[in-house]
A protein has these predicted regions:
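N-terminal secretory signal peptides
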Residues: 1-11, 22-25
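Boundary at the C-terminal end of the N-terminal hydrophobic targeting segment
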Residues: 32-34
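Sec-dependent N-terminal signal peptides
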Residues: 18-20
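Alpha/beta-hydrolase superfamily serine-hydrolase fold, recognizing
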Residues: 36-346
Length: 346
């Protein structure tokens, strides 16, 4: 079992964020209360007087803020624009991905970026977007990290929560069926079904963790270890506190959903090594979710590597997966036992 801190992979960043946020990320301790969180926030998001508590010492406004990335990512538009440009460049170099249906619904498609190597491993990526936005094409910029290293890269399209009446069970089922499809059809595009990996960011990391804690033998009549490893970046693994936040405005949380789709409660089904990661400039609640998930995996006796990206906010953190020399890019290639490509993408 391996647990590592990112001291050896820290990357110096330019000072993108306001001083209050930078100070916050450095000062936040391993346990951050709602009261402590208040003093780190920029003036424009300072909470009103405290209301009734809804979770631990968080009131409703504080729990909403704890799961809202907007105040913590002042450069979100710049990141989105940059990634769109990098995605267009990647597709221009690699060519349009093969878009193939894994189910009958119009949205149920995978986009496959193939490597030139035969019988190659496959990384399946699940996009984030707070369960209500995002799509497979939006992470095309990550594809070259894998293709150049000798792996196929597959991004998955699935419904967003508002499209399925707020039911995350539908989205989880789609993701599982997509993975099962890739396993059964891997050889048709030169993939090795016995080297299947899953990765995800934010709400996609939650869905990746759901996939990693699925009983594949019971539910799909597939090998129990269909997935060989996984990477979960900045996800949510216990849905109870999330259900108390503004997310409940578009996700219809139920006790059954919270129980079935909280990966931290099903670690007995986790059979493979995972990487859990978050940025040091993320909200304290996101940091806590990932820190506690990694600790729970370790306590369960399962292999886990825990990474903290110093100087990275929520969006910048998973952006490093689009560079083979980035924190996540290097980590996932090492997890897949692949060499970093000889040349980094421009």
């Amino acid at each position: 079992m391996k647990e590592s801190q990112p001291s050896g992979v820290r990357i110096t960043r330019r000072s993108l964020l306001c001083g209050a946020l930078t100070t916050a990320a450095v000062a936040i301790s391993s346990k951050v209360s709602a009261q402590e969180m208040q003093k780190y926030l920029p003036p424009r998001v300072q909470p009103k007087p405290k209301g009734p508590l809804v979770f631990l010492d968080y009131d409703k406004e504080e729990i909403d803020l704890a799961y809202d990335q907007a105040p913590w990512v002042p450069n979100a538009r710049e990141i989105s624009k940059r990634n769109a440009e990098k995605s267009a460049t990647a597709i221009a170099r690699l060519g349009e991905p093969r878009r193939i249906a894994y189910g009958s619904a119009e949205i149920e498609k995978v986009e496959i970026y193939t490597t030139k190597k035969t019988n190659a491993p496959i990384n399946i990526f699940l996009h984030g977007g707070a369960w209500r936005s995002g799509n497979a094409r939006g992470v095309a910029y990550m594809s070259e990290t894998f293709v150049d290293a000798g792996s196929h890269f597959i991004s998955v399209d699935f419904n967003n929560a508002p499209e399925v009446d707020g039911n995350l069970m539908v989205m989880a089922d789609q993701v599982r069926r997509a993975i099962a499809w890739v396993y059964k059809n891997a050889m048709s595009f030169g993939g090795d079904p016995n080297r299947l990996y899953v990765s995800g960011n934010s709400s996609g990391a939650h869905l990746a963790a759901v996939a990693l804690t699925t009983d594949w033998k019971k539910d799909f009549a597939l090998p129990a270890d269909i997935l060989k490893a996984g990477l979960c970046c900045s996800g949510m693994y216990d849905l109870h506190p999330v259900s108390l936040s503004a997310s409940a405005g578009y996700v219809k949380f139920t006790p059954e959903m919270i129980e079935k789709l909280s990966p931290q409660r099903h670690l007995d089904k986790l059979l493979v090594p995972i990487i859990v990661a978050h940025g040091a400039l993320e909200t304290p609640k996101f940091q806590r979710q990932n820190r506690e998930f990694a600790a729970a995996v370790k306590q369960a006796g399962k292999p886990v590597t825990f990474l903290v990206g110093q100087g990275y906010n929520h969006f910048e953190m998973f952006e490093t997966m689009g560079n083979p020399y980035g924190l996540l890019g290097r980590a996932v290639l090492e997890q897949m036992k692949l060499n970093v490509a000889c040349t980094a993408p421009s």
